[in-house]
Amino acid sequence: VTVTAILPVPMVFARRRDAVFAAVAGVSPLIRAVRALEAAADVVIAVAVPLADEVAEALVGQSFSRVRVVVSDSPGERVHCLAAGLAAVDTSHVVVHDLQWPTIGTGVVDRIAVALREEAVAVMPARPVTDSVKAVDSGGVLTATLDRSQLRTVQYPRGFTADVLAQLVHRHRSGPFDELEAALSAGIPVTLIEGDDEALRVELPRDAGYLAALIATRQDPPVR
C-alpha cells in the first residue's frame, strides 16, 4: 500500500506560531515532522491562509523532494485543512499527523501502511497506560483504583483509507475535529498498532525544554 501523509497547519496556530516555527533542539516542529513523514511517504502540508507564506518560507533551503503545500478554504480549521489535503492526494490511503506531536517514532508510518494493506480502514498507534489510574468522587476524594489493562494512549500519526477519511471530514463541517472521535461516532472500526513510548503531545513553547531533552536522548535524524 502506498500512503500519502497529510500534515494540517490550521488557523489555531496563527495564535501559536512558536508551536510551528520556533526551533527546538535546532529544528522547528514543522520541519521535524515533515522530515520524519517524508522518510516514509509523500507529504501534503495543508495550511490555513494566514500561515501559508510562513510555511512556504520555512521550507526554503530544505532538500525536500516529496512535499507539496496546499491552502485550505476559510476559516482554515483542522477539518478544512484535511479536506484540502485529501483533494490533493491521489493515493487510496493516507496518514494524518498533528503538529502537537512533533516526534514520530521510527517505523510507525510503515506499520500503519502494513495494517492498511491488511484491509484496516482506520489505524492508530497506541501504547498501554502505565500510570496508576484513580477514580474520584465529586468532592475530589479518591474512591478506587481502575483496571488499566484495557486502557490505551492513542497517538499520531493515524492512517485511513482516503474514502473513509473523506466521509468523516464531509460529516464535520466546522469546529474542533478529531479523527478518532469521528471514526468511533460513525461506527468505523479502528485498528490499533504498536506505538512509540517516546511519542508525546506537547504544548509549545511551554514544553520546549522537555521536548529538547527527549530529542537528545533518542536517535534523531541529523539536521540538514
Predicted regions and their residues:
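N-terminal glycine-rich phosphate-binding loop and ensuing alpha1 helix
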Residues: 1-54
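Residue-level signal for inorganic ion chemistry
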Residues: 30, 85, 97-98, 128, ...
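Short phosphate-binding loop-to-helix
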Residues: 61-94
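Hydrophobic packing residues within well-ordered alpha-helices of enzyme cores
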Residues: 55-59, 112, 133, 211
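SAM-dependent methyltransferases
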Residues: 1-10, 33-36, 179-180, 197-199, ...
